């Protein structure tokens, strides 16, 4: 089989055509993590503004704050896994 490769070459990424996409994927994880953290901060500000402006929309504000916690946790996890 001419197209078969040894799995250790893929894991260690010694070949340039395998190593470069893995580096690009690693970089994109941290970029996605930063974007998720920024979106989560935006959701926190929207939730705080909704809570301070009107008392009738507490459900919407709490949904924004819960979404921000989920997105922030995911973004922090991606950045933490990228740097470890």
Swiss-Prot record:
Principal place of residence: virion
Subcellular location, record wording: Virion membrane
Keywords: Late protein, Membrane, Transmembrane, Transmembrane helix, Virion
Record keyword Membrane present: yes
Recorded GO CC terms: membrane; virion membrane
UniProt induction comment: Expressed in the late phase of the viral replicative cycle.
Membrane-crossing residue ranges in chain numbering: 31-51, 60-80
Family label: Belongs to the asfivirus EP84R family.
The protein, known as: Transmembrane protein EP84R
The organism of origin for this protein: African swine fever virus (strain Badajoz 1971 Vero-adapted)
Organism placement in taxonomy: Viruses, Varidnaviria, Bamfordvirae, Nucleocytoviricota, Pokkesviricetes
